[in-house]
């Protein structure tokens, strides 16, 4: 049975002594003693990781801390995971969290006095300090931050402390915790949790995105030139936004038929847009030059997905431009990026064997001890003992950023053993730049999830996994900004229609439940596949962009019967990227499951890729 505990996951260096904790909230103690840190120290991660100090303070009169929720028993506890708490301390922490969630401070205080292992005391204190029923003072908050600035609740405690800061009070230790990020890998890498400026950063990103979508390019550049924008987002993210805005401006010019002169200094995305415009006009020489600029972009300015796309299309454009000597070299360069869409297509076209190393790091004794000896890893192991998997994943993800490869391997091994595929993918993405130094990286990036659809699979596992990996990164609690739910990111209206028309056996089911969500998702996939003659490109595009948009693109895109040109011409960035990533996921999961990849053969031969059921023991598509 789930026990939901509101608060910023519990935590406290400012916990009061047992007798003081027994006092009522209306009569708080004068000054709480500091709880001791666990004996373990962090050796896997670089010491003293800098934390940016916020420059914008929230308004005191309106600040309310956004307290996360910790759930105990939200997942079965895996019996043979490494542990750090004995049974007595584990059960005592459970009672403390439950008592504090109910505002039973005296009962919680009595249990706190008996705690021997201090591993989760940071969580206990944060639960109290962030409770709406507890008037935390500035000195308490400052003391907690001094002990636990690396804690997941540190950003919320920091913001609350800023709002309650008094003249002459102790200096605050900035929060150093780096949490989950959203967006493309390049934008995610540029972002950190910046404490007080996080709301301002989110507002700026929303404004910039609206300007890009509405054609307000000049206004966007003016906003990016402001010092306050650079202070809030940081110079790296500002440069990424400049590239994105310039690309959108060039796209608008291309759609109006304006030819943009070749510039070496253009961002790769901008050259890509101009190259595709030249290709569709039939100017293969210009297209080849542009695609070569994309392929030759330095790795710090372009992802492996961009580089492989530039190389693949440079090969194709050069062949059509009468430069056959450049075809094979650029195609081989595309194939170097083995898990990308164009990398896989290039490998297939060259007749190369697609054989990633699927072995995942084993959680042996050495790696278990490494986690126990790390401050973050120790907290995560204790949380897993309580069944608090979401909180544990936050800790492990944060601890793996910029970590030693051996520590990352330990986290990936734990994710595999604890059946946490979402953690595995997120940790892998966070360590993409050092992937060649991490054993079992490819296997960790494409985990086999532990869930099954209610009633079993009616669509191949590889395709369902491919959509899940892209839609939610295997996070069953994922919710998009527009309300899409769960593993398959179903919109509420879509879930209702699918449940009533195509999956009546799921009537009354909870769409957040993994098995129900997967059942509804695969039923929707089956409907989409049936509507486009099993065309995988149009199915993926319809799942993300909507079937109506697919019908419009079929009528307006100048792609003929060229599936690769069709994909590259999809006007919505998100949908274009989605199609490529889902298909790449699908093919890689087929390889991992020991299945052939007929749709990859088809697209490499410039034919439309079509779904062919291969999980014969799992049934066939409805």
Q: Where do the protein language model's features map onto the residues?
A:
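Alpha-helical segment of the N-proximal tetratricopeptide repeat
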Residues: 90-104, 194, 198-219, 248, ...
């Amino acid at each position: 049975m789930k026990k939901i505990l509101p608060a910023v996951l519990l935590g406290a260096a400012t916990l009061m002594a047992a007798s003081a904790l027994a006092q009522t909230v209306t009569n708080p103690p004068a000054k709480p003693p500091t709880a001791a840190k666990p004996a373990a120290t962090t050796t896997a991660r670089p010491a003293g990781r800098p934390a940016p100090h916020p420059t914008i303070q929230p308004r005191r009169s309106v600040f309310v801390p956004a307290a996360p929720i910790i759930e105990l028993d939200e997942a079965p506890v895996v019996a043979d995971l490494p542990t750090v708490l004995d049974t007595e301390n584990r059960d005592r922490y459970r009672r403390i969290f439950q008592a504090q969630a109910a505002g039973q401070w005296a009962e919680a205080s009595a249990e706190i006095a008996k705690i021997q292992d201090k591993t989760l005391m940071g969580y206990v204190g944060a639960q109290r300090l962030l409770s709406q029923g507890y008037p935390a003072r500035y000195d308490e908050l400052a003391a907690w931050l001094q002990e636990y600035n690396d804690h997941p609740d540190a950003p919320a405690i920091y913001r609350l402390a800023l709002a309650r800061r008094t003249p002459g009070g102790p200096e605050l230790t900035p929060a150093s915790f780096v949490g989950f990020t959203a967006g493309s890998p390049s934008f995610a890498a540029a972002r950190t949790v910046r404490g007080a400026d996080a709301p301002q950063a989110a507002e700026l990103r929303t404004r910039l995105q609206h300007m890009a979508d509405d054609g307000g390019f000049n206004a966007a550049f003016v906003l990016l030139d402001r010092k306050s924008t650079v202070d809030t987002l940081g110079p790296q993210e500002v440069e990424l936004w400049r590239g994105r805005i310039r690309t959108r401006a060039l796209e608008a010019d291309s759609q109006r038929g304006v030819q943009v002169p070749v510039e070496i200094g253009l961002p790769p995305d901008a050259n890509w847009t101009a190259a595709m415009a030249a290709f569709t006009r039939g100017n293969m020489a210009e297209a080849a030059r542009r695609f070569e600029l994309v392929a030759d972009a330095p790795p710090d300015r372009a992802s492996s997905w961009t580089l492989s796309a530039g190389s693949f299309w440079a090969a194709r454009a050069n062949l059509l431009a009468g430069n056959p000597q450049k075809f094979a070299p650029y195609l081989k360069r595309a194939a170097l990026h083995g898990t990308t869409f164009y990398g896989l297509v290039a490998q297939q076209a060259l007749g190369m064997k697609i054989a990633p190393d699927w072995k995942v790091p084993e959680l042996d004794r050495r790696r278990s001890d490494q986690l126990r000896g790390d401050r973050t890893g120790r907290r995560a192991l204790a949380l897993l003992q309580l069944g608090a998997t979401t909180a544990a994943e936050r800790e492990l993800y944060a601890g793996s950023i910029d970590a030693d490869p051996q520590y990352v391997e330990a986290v990936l091994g734990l994710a595999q053993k604890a059946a946490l595929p979402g953690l595995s993918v997120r940790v892998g993405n966070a360590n993409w730049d050092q992937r060649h130094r991490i054993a079992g990286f490819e296997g960790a990036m494409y985990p086999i999830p532990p869930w099954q659809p209610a009633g079993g699979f009616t669509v191949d596992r590889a395709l369902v996994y491919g959509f899940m990996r892209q839609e939610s990164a295997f996070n069953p609690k994922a919710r998009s900004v527009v309300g899409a739910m769960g593993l398959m990111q179903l919109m509420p209206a879509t879930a209702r229609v699918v449940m009533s028309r195509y999956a009546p056996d799921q009537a009354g089911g909870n769409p957040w439940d993994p098995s129900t969500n997967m059942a509804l998702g695969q039923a929707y996939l089956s409907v989409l596949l049936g509507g486009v003659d099993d065309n995988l490109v149009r199915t993926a595009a319809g799942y993300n962009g909507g079937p109506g948009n697919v019908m419009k693109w079929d009528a307006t895109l100048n792609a003929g019967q060229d599936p690769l040109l069709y994909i590259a011409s999809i006007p919505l960035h998100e949908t274009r990227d989605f199609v490529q990533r889902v298909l790449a996921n699908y093919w890689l999961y087929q390889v991992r499951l020991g299945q052939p990849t007929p749709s990859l053969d088809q697209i490499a031969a410039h034919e439309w890729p079509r779904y062919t059921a291969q999980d014969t023991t799992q049934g066939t598509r409805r």
